[in-house]
Structures are given as structure tokens and as C-alpha cells.
């Protein structure tokens, strides 16, 4: 995905393709009724179905990376940390004498560790050679060492000295170009999400969306394009919607569903 100019979320992909399916399958082999993880999220039973909600402690809410779990899977899962805060968790761990009680929170990708993910990726995929960094008028302002190292909205590593901060506004994979511009050029109001899944049946009222992990909820309307693709229209334009990230839809604290942000509509908006 990095070589396609997309910005994936490894935690979502891990939960979707690796962690939970195998975890639940193994639990069944051991005759266990449920599995439990330390994610900050809540499961709420409603009539005959199960809902996924944001954690009570919103500072650590991880429901975004769990959006692919449907009601059937939620029935087999417990999230015991969903109703308590991180300080409370630390205190419980300290009382039990656990050495990790006051371990610093990790912001790293677990299988990369403290290394720069760009170096990790460049050793594992055939990345493009150097290319141009240009503005919206195709004026050359610099060069880059591979599109895998850039994401929409990125400021770090972007050539400056032009009177104002510049950001990555578009990644042209075919021509190996990085486009940069002002923050205003990052504004997006409509985009598509694909490979969409829902926790349960969907209601279309009072919806909002997060366009990346722990971002603010933005009120939105959604419209079905086909069985797995939906158009998102934001009530208010937002900045830095990056193809490859996930758009996760909420109804207040209830997680409705989500899908991967595509580049199709984004490119039309930028132009």
C-alpha cells in the first residue's frame, strides 16, 4: 500500500486479518467461551445483538481500530478496560505488583518498534527511485527519495522557505510526484470509503466520522455507491483526509462501521 501512495493503518489491518479471527478460533479449540483483550472499547448488548461503543475513557479510546468486528464476533469478545481509565489500570497493576504498571505508553508499531517505519518499509518493498516534489502549478520545489515516505497532510520533510508552511496535498504514483501546497489545499468535503463493513444494521441519522485514529468526529451524511463502497459528505470540510486510512462511522458513542478511504474523489477535490 505504501508503494501505491496510500497510508495504511497497520493496527486495523492486523485486527482485520490476523488477530481476532485466529484468537477466537484458538479459544474454541480450547473450549473457551470468550476471548479478552486490553483494548479500550466497550461492548453493549442490545436485544439480540451486540454493539461496539467508544471507551468511557476517551483519551485512550481504541474503537477506531476495531471497526471491522461485527455483532457475531463481539458476542465472543470481552473488553474489560472499556469502563475504566488508564490511571486506574496503572493503579490496579501496581497493586498486583506488575512491573509494567508505570511503563511508558508506546506509540510505535509493535512489529517495527522504535525504528522509523520508512526504513522498515523500504527494505521490504520495491520502492520507486527519486522523484520530483512540485506545487499545484507543476513548479519543481525539490526531490524525494520514494513516495512510500509521504502521506497526505504531512509537513515534516516537506521543502519550505516559501513564506508559509507547506504540506503534502497529493501523491501521484504514476508519475512518481509529490504535490505540496498550503493547508487550505488539504480541505476535503466529499470522499469515498471502500471495503465497508458494518457492526450490525445501519441507521443513517446523526452520523459522524473519524478519518484517522483519535481524530475528531466530523458530522457527515453517507450514501451507498455499491455493496462495499459509500460516499461520505462532511457537514464541514476537514483537513488531511489520507487515502489508505480508514473512515470510521459513529452514532454518538456507538460505532456503526467503516471502510478504507480511497483516492478517487479526493483527487477531484484537490484539483
Spans of model-derived segments:
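Nucleotide-activated chemistry modules centered on ATP-dependent adenylation/adenylyltransferase
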Residues: 1-255, 259-271
Amino acid at each position: 500500500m505504501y508503494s501505491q501512495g496510500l497510508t495504511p493503518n497497520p493496527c486495523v489491518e492486523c485486527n482485520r486479518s490476523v488477530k481476532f479471527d485466529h484468537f477466537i478460533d484458538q479459544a474454541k479449540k480450547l473450549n473457551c467461551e470468550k476471548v479478552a483483550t486490553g483494548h479500550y472499547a466497550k461492548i453493549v448488548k442490545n436485544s439480540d445483538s451486540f454493539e461496539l461503543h467508544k471507551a468511557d475513557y476517551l483519551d485512550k479510546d481504541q474503537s477506531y481500530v476495531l471497526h471491522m468486528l461485527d455483532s457475531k464476533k463481539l458476542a465472543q469478545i470481552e473488553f474489560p478496560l472499556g469502563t475504566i481509565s488508564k490511571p486506574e489500570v496503572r493503579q490496579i497493576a501496581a497493586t498486583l505488583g506488575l512491573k509494567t504498571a508505570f511503563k511508558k505508553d508506546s506509540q510505535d508499531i509493535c512489529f517495527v518498534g522504535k525504528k522509523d517505519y520508512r526504513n522498515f518499509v523500504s527494505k521490504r518493498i520495491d520502492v520507486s527511485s527519486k522523484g520530483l516534489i512540485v506545487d499545484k502549478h507543476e513548479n519543481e520545489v525539490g526531490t524525494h527519495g520514494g513516495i512510500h515516505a509521504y502521506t497526505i497532510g504531512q509537513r515534516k520533510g516537506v521543502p519550505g522557505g516559501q513564506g508559509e508552511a507547506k504540506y503534502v496535498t497529493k501523491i501521484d504514483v504514476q508519475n512518481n510526484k509529490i504535490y505540496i501546497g498550503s493547508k487550505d489545499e488539504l480541505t476535503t468535503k466529499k470522499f469515498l470509503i471502500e471495503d465497508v463493513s458494518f457492526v450490525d444494521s445501519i441507521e443513517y441519522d446523526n452520523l459522524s466520522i473519524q478519518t484517522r485514529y483519535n481524530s475528531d468526529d466530523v458530522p457527515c451524511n453517507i450514501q451507498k455507491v455499491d455493496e462495499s463502497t459509500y460516499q461520505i459528505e462532511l457537514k464541514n470540510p476537514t483537513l488531511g483526509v489520507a487515502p489508505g486510512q480508514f473512515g470510521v462511522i459513529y452514532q454518538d458513542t456507538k460505532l456503526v462501521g467503516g471502510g478504507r478511504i480511497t483516492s478517487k474523489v479526493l483527487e477531484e477535490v484537490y484539483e
